[in-house]
Every structure is written in structure tokens, then in C-alpha cells.
């Protein structure tokens, strides 16, 4: 049986494999994309193979990062795209945000009874990949 940590491992290895294959085998397509981007006044893209494992930033820590970065958010709020920008400034590249409040997740997401958030709320085994 797999738990949330195992699923995150599968996802990060899959993304690492995809990016590795693109970097190794698709330079012609990357060149076509970059030719178009340059013609539109945009910078060319590069394929950067992500390192594994991806950082895990528990929801409670992510909330503190957002607050420290000047964002307005409270425990139990959703992490919105502008909050993700604050987190990404500290953790560029792929990263997981696990252990969201159980109250935010659907009924089929599991939890561990002993895991509580900073406010005492039950934490889920759910996660987001950013």
C-alpha cells in the first residue's frame, strides 16, 4: 500500500524522467519554440532537469513563509497564486505543499489522527505540487 510520501516520490521521479527525456531527445523542438519566442520578443527557454527529491514545505510552514514575505493569509485559508509566488521566491522549481487542513479537503482524503496544525486543526495527507 502506498501513502502520500510514496505518491509524491512517484510524481517527482516521473517529472524528472520527462524533463530528462525532453532535454536529451527534443532539442530540435526546443529550438523551434525558442525561434518563435525570440520572434515575439521573448527570452528563449531552457530545459532544466529538476533535482529529486523535491522540497516538501508543510502547509503550516508555507503559511509562515507567505506571512514573512508580506502576504496576507491565515491558517485554514487556501494558498492562492500570488501566495505561491512568495513561496517560489524561497523555493524555486518544483516543490510539494503537504499536510493541508483536513477541513479544506474532500471526504476521500485520509489523515493521521496524531497530526495537528499550529491552530490545533486536523491535518490531511493531501498535498499540492507547485
Task: Describe each model-derived feature in a short phrase.
Residues 1-17, 30-130:
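A translation/RNA-centric and nucleic-acid-associated enzymatic feature enriched
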Residues 25-29:
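Residue-level recognition of alpha-helix termini/interfacial anchor residues
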Amino acid at each position: 500500500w502506498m501513502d502520500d510520501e510514496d505518491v509524491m516520490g512517484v510524481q517527482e521521479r516521473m517529472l524528472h524522467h520527462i524533463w530528462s527525456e525532453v532535454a536529451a531527445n527534443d532539442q530540435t523542438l526546443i529550438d523551434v519554440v525558442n525561434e518563435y519566442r525570440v520572434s515575439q520578443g521573448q527570452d528563449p527557454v531552457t530545459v532544466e532537469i529538476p533535482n529529486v527529491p523535491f522540497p516538501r514545505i508543510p502547509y503550516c510552514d508555507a503559511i509562515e513563509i507567505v506571512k514573512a514575505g508580506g502576504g496576507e493569509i491565515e491558517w485554514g485559508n487556501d494558498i492562492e497564486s500570488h501566495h505561491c509566488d512568495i513561496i517560489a521566491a524561497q523555493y524555486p522549481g518544483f516543490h510539494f505543499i503537504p499536510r493541508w487542513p483536513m477541513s479544506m479537503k474532500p471526504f476521500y482524503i485520509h489523515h493521521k489522527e496524531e497530526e495537528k496544525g499550529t491552530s490545533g486543526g486536523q491535518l490531511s495527507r493531501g498535498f499540492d505540487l507547485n
